[in-house]
Amino acid sequence: MAPCKPRTFTAGQDPLTKFDGAISVRNLPRPPDRLFLFHGIMRPSRGIYAKLIATGQKPPTHFHPSQWEFFRVLRGNLTIDFNGRAIHRTASDGELAVPPYTHHVIYGTPGTEMNEVEFVVSASDPAAEEQGATVMDQPFFENWYGYQEDVFQRGEKLDFIQVLSMFDAGGTYLSPPWWVPFRSWVGLFLGIVVGRWIGGLLGYAPFYPEWTTDWEAACETMQQSWFQRRFADPQAQERAREKFRGQLEQEASAKGGKSE
């Protein structure tokens, strides 16, 4: 086991497209009562989602101890496992609110795998202004998607401590199986003790400059934990940008060619 070493530089990309186009997320102007508002397009027939469907798997079930999460389908079919109950949503169903401590996961509705799913997701959190509070936000999504892409498409080995570290910093915790007693408390223990404390001591950062657009905000979050403040290096992103200069110049050239 070892902390991840990002293989791409995607900080600043908007929309952020991952897994050969299987998921694309872009920022929208957020309402005053929401921490973020993302517009997402999920293509279940591509990339990681196609692999999960082929093996009958789903993304990891998780929960948020203080955040409310909101989903609204604009096009296609989306399923949300809501405390073990599958809820199927379409554009006619309006917004679905997911309260704190709800064990949930979203995926394309089975039987409609070839459809694109267009949706918006947002969140609110009364504890967001509290000192030391962690929240699910853009840096979390950028790092989680970046890490998954390296694992599933570039041969990076999946590391449980790395996952726990990223989830904890995003105010998100993996849900143990339903039969585990006090499953939410077990999830919190794993995220905080193993992900944040032990992971920090072992060199696992929750955010990486190669993937994080607002690196300054990520550094501020890591500064709040004694176990993670050593990763809060304001100059790290410039060094990472220099390391990946060849990739960035190639991408800029490709974009310029398309616009001509």
Swiss-Prot record:
It is an enzyme of class 1 (oxidoreductase). Keywords: Oxidoreductase. The keyword Metal-binding does not apply. Signal peptide: none annotated. One of its GO terms (molecular function) is oxidoreductase activity. Its EC number is 1.-.-.-. InterPro entries: RmlC-like_jellyroll, RmlC_Cupin_sf. GO terms for biological process: terpenoid biosynthetic process. Pathway: Secondary metabolite biosynthesis; terpenoid biosynthesis. Oxidoreductase; part of the gene cluster that mediates the biosynthesis of macrophorins, isoprenoid epoxycyclohexenones containing cyclized drimane moieties. The first step of the pathway is the synthesis of 6-methylsalicylic acid (6-MSA) by the polyketide synthase macA. 6-MSA is then converted to m-cresol by the decarboxylase macB. The cytochrome P450 monooxygenase macC then catalyzes the oxidation of m-cresol to toluquinol. The macrophorins cluster contains a single gene insertion (encoding for the terpene cyclase macJ) compared with the yanuthone cluster that produces the linear compound yanuthone. Belongs to the oxidoreductase OpS7 family. This is Oxidoreductase macE. The gene is macE.
